[in-house]
Amino acid sequence: NALPTPNAAAFYTSGLTSNEAAFCYQLFARQFGTNNLPDCSNMCHESSGAALNEAIGIGKGCVTLEDFEHADGIFIMGQNPGTNHPRMMTVLERAKHSGATIVALNPMAEPGLMQVLNPNPQEYHGAHLLQFPFKMLFNIGTPLSDLWLPLRPNGDMAALRGIMKEMLAEEEKRPGTVFDREFIATYTDGSEAFLAHIRATPWDVILRGSGLTREQIRAAAEIAMKCKRIICCWAMGLTQHKNAVATIQEIMNFLLLGGHIGRQGAGPCPVRGHSNVQGDRTMGIWDRMNDHFMTKLGREFGFSPPMEHGTDSVETIKAMREGKIRFFFGLGGNFLSATPDTEYTARAMQNCRLTAHVSTKLNRSHLITGEIALILPCLGRSEIDRQESGDQFVTVEDSMGIINPSRGHLKPASEHLRSEPAIVAGLAEATLGARTTVDWKGLAANYDRIRDHIEHVIDGFENFNERIRENVFYLPNEARDRRKFNNGIGKAKFIISEIDPHDLEPGQYLMMTVRSHDQFNTTIYGLNDRYRGVYNGRRVVFMNAEDVRASGLQQGQFVDLTSHYRGETRVARHFMVAPFNIPRGCTATYFPEANVLVSINSTADRSNTPVSKSVVITIAPSAEPAAAVAELHRTLKASAQVKNRP
């Protein structure tokens, strides 16, 4: 309340926040008077939402889990499901058993893209029951990818353009046998201009941009032409590039040519990570919610929400650095480690008057603070949440648009812990006082009341409390369910974009950040990445073996990495060289260690997502190899101490 303006505050949300907590949180921020609601989606799938909203009128995927069992083609792009979405491996295995052909487009030969060994005995039924001990004993998995395309980072648009160029050539030879002309004529706009654009794209631009051969592209096109029901999956390997939105719209162009949306076994599938990052957006966690939502929110609670756009994550960091935002509130998450340009972001956080975090465990964001810092411990979702009206449950929305209940069963770690909804409601009541029109105590006492308000404000939640007690349910998705595209013109759009060649100067490499297998987002559980053969360390740079030799380096050598962005340089020291099956001129490092190399000013067009997957770097032998060895020893010692704690 001491701030000069409500816009001097920012309310950040982690994707682990429940629907009920998120709804209360955005209501608190807007009754306070600001739309400064940055969230973790700004760093990951913001590009997906921007791309899909323009193309098909909804920022979510358009497939169900059941669709995977009916797809005959699945294209996995910029995603490593074995490490980042392990539960998806069962879905892909079932799809393979149902006859699907899988094409993987990824710079790295990830084991999780190649095969799956399912450790769950319940997945083996009937005649397959005896396969379980045999597969476990001899380590025999189910092959996944039928074709792997080792493109360069950000080569996806060029690869897709090449696939469609091959398909167009066949369609012109045999009209009506490759493209779904009836669907295109009935449900889309801009097809003729887009097809002309494909014809005009030279093959040398496609091959240079993708890093693939004509034969590899032809092989993928032949698979696509045989398939009648295609699903395209993608994750941050696509969303964190300068042209990420355009690339995802190229995926939609590919799907639209075959009519692969709005029918069983087909559609776009952006695969999100956190358990409720999609649900938080549905609940209103966004700095620029539409007028329809804001009008209904204001009507439900009898106030006038602020209508000017707020700040996203990158804009919030810059505003803190400039002194425009003086109060930062984090509802979960690890903001410092999730964001780019670590040193810049740290100084921005330290420029605040007050930083506060609601958390279940300590993380690095609690160490880099404003002048005053608060840590508000809260119940984990696995713990019993008992309020005035009795035991409570919350809900989340997954990547398929399914609303699931979540109820804790463990005794709370402390009798003093409060739940996220209770903390938000208590803070809102104390902060807003007589200004509020909300019965915050009543919401905290019984989450059914929160869900009643959600039902009144957000479409698709009719009879929310009754339905969620009966079963999980899908939210409506008109693009998927009715082939209705609410994008302003009522038809799915073919959108034309140019291929970015991303040419490098001699001695430069294109770096992308990735996660290890012992890691979930910013939470690091150990120093091993067994699927890539890395043990006891994370400061690793994966390089093509020929690049290692050509640059005079050796496996295991310590090097310093320098990023280059518009005349700016940033340095990350003491990384160990690790040869890997990755295209020449390309490298990979672990997130968040390499976030220091990502410029705060390098963001995707239209989504403002940090460009963490195409960072231009140079590599030099470490200036202080002895210090690098000492740092490694300290890391190993600290890791051993953590493991040996009782």
Where are each of the predicted segments found?
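Cofactor-pocket helix-loop regions in the catalytic cores of large enzyme subunits
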Residues: 1-272, 298-480, 536-573
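Structured loops at beta-to-helix junctions and adjacent beta-edge loops in soluble globular domains
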Residues: 14, 235-237, 271-273, 378-379, ...
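Surface-exposed loop and adjacent secondary-structure segments within mature catalytic domains
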Residues: 122, 284-288
